[in-house]
A protein has these predicted regions:
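A short, charged helix-loop
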Residues: 1-5, 16
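A polyampholytic, Gly/Pro-enriched intrinsically disordered region
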Residues: 10-21, 151-162, 239-253
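Extended, charge-rich low-complexity interaction segments
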Residues: 24-38, 158-180, 249-256
Length: 256
């Protein structure tokens, strides 16, 4: 649960991590260098927002699983300037493409990392598109130092603690805030709650969220998977049935 005690613990752990990294690389921590890096990352994140806007309107030629793979590569880029340049070109190429007309879902829960794209690929084959995803990385595409940049590391710790929507926290208000924001912004036809086997903490908020989804008349399906491929046929059947349900609800809304 998020409170002053857990926040101070997080700050202490981050401080220890910074000291360890500084010893390892042989460089001292500098608040001005941190702020310069944050400003650089904020420029990249602005492009990420533009990319997301363009990609969500170009799903006929650039499926959701490719959008997710591009976002994953942000954390793996060895040359951020080169990565940023490629993303700007991709964003420009996607602008103006035809939007996707089929049912669209919001993917929530256990993070889906490349190459474990079993569910995103099955969704695409079933004619269902991913309009957005919410997991422990969601808040990391926002500006790092939106407030009090002069405080350096403390501002960094405060930002990530306050914006952490992962299931590590019970009664996570940030998760609910992210869900409300994405539902309003992406207007999904349904919700897929993804849980990797063993990660039961991702179920902690499901009951609470289901009440909100019911209020918004959004059907929900919980999919539990692992890294094996033996369950693909079962997942395919359930996903196709869920896609038909969303399509039927769409028709009912259009005739209402």
């Amino acid at each position: 649960m998020k409170n002053e005690f857990t926040y101070r613990g997080f700050v202490s752990e981050l401080d220890h991590a910074i000291r360890t990294i500084c010893r390892h690389v042989g460089r001292r921590y500098n608040v001005f260098a941190l702020n310069r890096s944050a400003a650089r990352l904020n420029e990249v994140r602005s492009t990420i927002h533009a990319f997301l806007d363009a990609a969500r309107g170009a799903e006929t030629i650039f499926p959701g699983y490719l959008r997710m793979a591009v976002l994953d590569s942000f954390f793996m880029a060895s040359d951020l300037d080169d990565w940023h340049s490629h993303l700007q070109k991709l964003t420009a190429a996607l602008t103006g493409a035809a939007p996707f007309s089929g049912p669209r879902v919001l993917l929530i829960g256990s993070p889906v990392y490349y190459p474990n794209f079993k569910i995103p690929m099955l969704l695409r084959r079933a004619g269902v598109e991913i309009c957005g995803s919410i997991d422990s990385r969601t808040g990391q595409y926002e500006d790092v130092f939106a407030h009090k940049p002069e405080k350096g590391m403390e501002a960094l710790a405060h930002y990530y603690f306050e914006h952490d929507s992962s299931s590590a926290f019970v009664w996570n208000e940030e998760l609910m805030a992210a869900i409300r924001h994405y539902v309003a912004e992406t207007k999904p036809d349904g919700i897929i709650w993804h849980v990797l086997k063993g990660q039961i903490e991702y179920d902690f908020e499901l009951n609470r969220c289901e009440a909100y989804f019911e209020e918004k008349d959004l059907p929900v399906i919980r999919l539990e998977t692992d890294y094996q491929y033996q369950d693909i046929e079962q997942l395919r059947i359930r996903i196709e049935a869920f896609g038909e349900l969303m399509s039927q609800k769409r028709k009912e809304r259009s005739h209402a």
